[in-house]
Amino acid sequence: MRPLKQAIYSSRTADKFVVRLPDGMRERIAEVARNHHRSMNSEIIARLEQSLIQEGALGEELSMRLDSPELSLHERELLQRFRQLSHRQQNALVSLIAHDAEMAADAT
């Protein structure tokens, strides 16, 4: 089992899918995304991913254990420190990293 790699891509190359939202849902998603310091897209992706993880649909690779031999020492330390953060801090950090990755991809 290989560790999950975070794909770096720009919005131009990302897979796109149109979703029809019920009345008022767009505004609710926007508000929640603001509270989590994320874009609406990042909020939707995070919630879909969490739902799929809970159902077991994304497989074991996303539930990497700290004692996994596939984790390097640095990855293990990052994961351990990440898990010590509050949920809000985790969301902010993930949002920051995703934003930086998008900016780097757009610069190329």
From Swiss-Prot:
Gene Ontology MF terms: DNA binding
SUPFAM superfamilies: Ribbon-helix-helix
Annotated GO biological process: negative regulation of DNA-templated transcription
Observed phenotype of the null mutant: Deletion shows increased swimming motility, decreased biofilm formation and very limited ability for competitive colonization of rhizosphere.
Keyword Amino-acid biosynthesis carried by entry: no
Signal sequence, renumbered to the chain: none
Keywords, ordered alphabetically: Activator, DNA-binding, Repressor, Transcription, Transcription regulation
Reported function: Functions both as a transcriptional activator and a repressor of multiple genes encoding virulence factors as well as genes involved in environmental adaptation. Represses genes involved in iron homeostasis. Modulates intracellular levels of c-di-GMP which in turn regulates swimming motility and biofilm formation.
Name assigned to this protein: Transcription factor AmrZ
Gene this protein is translated from: amrZ
